[in-house]
Amino acid sequence: MTTPLAGRPLLDAHVNSPDVLAGLQRAFNLYEDALVHNKVDVLDALFWDSVHTLRYGAKENLNGYSEIKAFRASRPSVGLSRDILDCHIVTFGSSAGVANITFRRAGEPRVGRQSQTWVKFDMDFADGWRVVSAHVSWMDL
């Protein structure tokens, strides 16, 4: 359902326009597949190539695309599978959105949390959607 923003919107007018939401969901699914199968080139392509891009992980704070890319290249390629417990994707206008999930990994008693801010750029791959900010953390139960 498309919901107009309350008050005076500072971006174009709708939350979760069906076509925009579908595009971000496709990009998110592409990201998730690349993550669990260690497709580093796809992960790199889905992050905004900018010094302004951030990724705060469970054990690291990465500032800028080059730090994120170096992290991806050096991380272990095993133990990446996870089960998504809950997923919330919301788009704002035609070029911004957020994706938030909770997940579990085999052998890990904690619940993982991931938040991503996505912006749509004038690019072909993944309909132009890029992660501009990400945060991963663990929650003790």
Can you describe what each PLM-predicted range is?
Residues 27, 39-42, 72, 85, ...:
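Hydrophobic alpha-helical segments typical of transmembrane helices
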Residues 60-61, 109-113:
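Short, mixed charged/polar active-site loops
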Residues 2-4, 98, 111-141:
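Short beta-strand edge/turn micro-motifs at domain boundaries
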